[in-house]
């Protein structure tokens, strides 16, 4: 007899960012999901040349939540916690982003990874090293890929969600979960 499965619980979300516009779209999705699940959100940036001190260039949490109408303009970090989420920012000084992300996820496993993915075609596919898919595959973590040049289902301006279609890939091998 099959036991009843409990609803999906996501308590930790990981969002690697390169600070591009595409990553800003993925950030909005990661933040909105963290709010929905009352989860911890870890935002990570890997750079070979930037000092690990300071996080001024990271996506701005409180201004985003204020724009979404969830916090007042003059909110504090404590106000973010009252929304039921916890934010961690990680900067890795490394030349190999894939290796740094895999190392971080091995030390601090996550339930869901949300990241932008760039769809290269033709010759460009040979020149650019894929990051999103290999990390997801190697770490075997649930992943929300936010393709480049799309707005996705979360409005960056309002935080409102709009989902019309959902595609679930199903595979016999490996067994679906």
Q: What are the roles of these predicted feature ranges?
A:
Residues 60-71:
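A short acidic, glycine-rich active-site loop
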Residues 2-62, 162-177:
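Small/aliphatic-rich secondary-structure junction motif
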Residues 1-4, 32, 102-155:
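Gly/Ser-rich helix-loop-strand patches that form or flank binding pockets
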Residues 30, 76, 101:
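Aromatic/hydrophobic pocket-lining residues that form π-stacking "cages" and hydrophobic walls in ligand
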Residues 90-100:
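Charged docking surfaces used in two-component/phosphorelay signaling
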Residues 50-51, 58, 97, 122, ...:
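Generic structural signal for helix capping and beta-alpha/helix-loop junctions
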Residues 80-88:
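A short helix-to-beta-strand connector/capping loop
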